[in-house]
């Protein structure tokens, strides 16, 4: 089952790349048509920006994500309890020892990042370390180590990179609309516009407006099942389902994180870091804690 999931995650990586780059291309086409005088030129520019974001995140994902979340690296001397739990879980999972970080925040949360098990990292908040006992902490870290072992972190890294690129490009386009409007075409340009070009332009304008939401929905589509699998994989590592259940119940009562969490990286956390309510719940990248607990009870 595990190796099948790893293979599926690798296939999802390519599908994720395709969906995000298609969305980037639409946004770029709209930007090019409206402001650069060439839809194709804008499309190429957007794809180049997306490629740069992905390459940067693949090689610098740990440093970038940790900096985004204000995490500091620790070792066996400065955080022995966390370090030893990560070390134990990595040994059981048969992966290289990840780098270990702490986020100074009173809420309870944790996440993993990196592009492969060889350059992965795990982070936990000070609030998590203060509240969780050893068994619960093992459950949480086992969950994050499972993301590393199952290659979920590669999907997450690419998702963060491309979602950030889409949000940045769409934000720039919307600001240009507000401040300057589109490039004015002369009558000859309008008369020569093909029906297909107009269709692409309309789709691009829609993409510019809805791109950040679409990026979130793509992350949502790939995130929820990964969380269920990581919960189950954590129990496989710890042989202690009750420890994972107790940890999830505590996470359910945690307050939102106090420091700002970028929308693109929110899906990395074991627990929703924003604790939003109302209609925003529809766009959670995490399944409900109650559902995760119920699945563990059925194991």
UniProtKB/Swiss-Prot annotation:
* Gene3D superfamilies associated with the record: Metalloproteases ('zincins'), catalytic domain
Give a Gene Ontology cellular component term annotated to this protein.
plasma membrane
GO MF assignments: metalloendopeptidase activity; zinc ion binding
Tell me which residues bind Zn(2+): 143, 147, 227
Any idea which UniProt keywords this protein has? Cell membrane, Hydrolase, Membrane, Metal-binding, Metalloprotease, Protease, Transmembrane, Transmembrane helix, Zinc
One family from Pfam that matches here is Peptidase_M48
**Cysteine-cysteine disulfides:** none
Q: Indicate the transmembrane segments per the record.
A: 14-34, 39-59, 153-173, 198-218
Manner of cofactor binding, per the entry note: Binds 1 zinc ion per subunit.
For this protein, the Enzyme Commission number is: 3.4.24.-
In this protein, the active site sits at 144
List this protein's GO terms for biological process: proteolysis
Q: What class of enzyme is it?
A: hydrolase
**Similarity remark:** Belongs to the peptidase M48B family.
Protein name per its UniProtKB record: Protease HtpX homolog
């Amino acid at each position: 089952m595990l190796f099948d999931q790893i293979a599926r995650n690798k296939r999802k990586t390519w599908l994720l790349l395709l969906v995000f780059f298609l969305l980037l291309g639409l946004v770029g086409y709209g930007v090019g048509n409206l402001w650069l005088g060439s839809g194709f030129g804008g499309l190429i520019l957007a794809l180049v920006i997306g490629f740069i974001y992905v390459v940067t995140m693949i090689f610098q994902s740990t440093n970038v994500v940790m900096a985004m979340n204000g995490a500091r690296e620790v070792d066996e001397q400065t955080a022995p309890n966390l370090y030893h739990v990560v070390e134990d879980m990595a040994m059981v999972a048969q992966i290289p020892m990840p780098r270990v970080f702490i986020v100074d925040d009173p809420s309870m949360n944790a996440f993993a990042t990196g592009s492969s098990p060889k350059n992965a990292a795990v982070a936990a908040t000070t609030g998590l370390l203060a509240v969780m006992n050893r068994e619960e902490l093992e459950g949480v870290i086992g969950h994050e180590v499972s993301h590393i072992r199952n290659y979920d972190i590669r999907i997450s890294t690419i998702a963060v990179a491309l979602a950030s690129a889409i949000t940045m490009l769409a934000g720039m386009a919307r600001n240009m609309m507000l401040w300057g409007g589109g490039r004015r075409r002369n009558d000859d340009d309008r008369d020569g516009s093909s029906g297909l070009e107009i269709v692409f332009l309309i789709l691009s304008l829609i993409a510019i407006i809805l791109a950040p939401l679409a990026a979130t929905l793509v992350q949502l589509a790939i995130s929820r099942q990964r969380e269920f699998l990581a919960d189950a994989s954590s129990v496989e590592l710890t042989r202690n389902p009750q420890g994972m259940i107790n940890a999830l119940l505590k996470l359910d009562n945690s307050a939102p994180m106090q420091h700002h969490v970028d929308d693109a990286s929110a899906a990395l956390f074991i627990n929703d870091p924003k604790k939003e309510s109302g209609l925003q719940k529809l766009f959670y990248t995490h399944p409900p804690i109650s559902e995760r607990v119920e699945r563990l009870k059925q194991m």
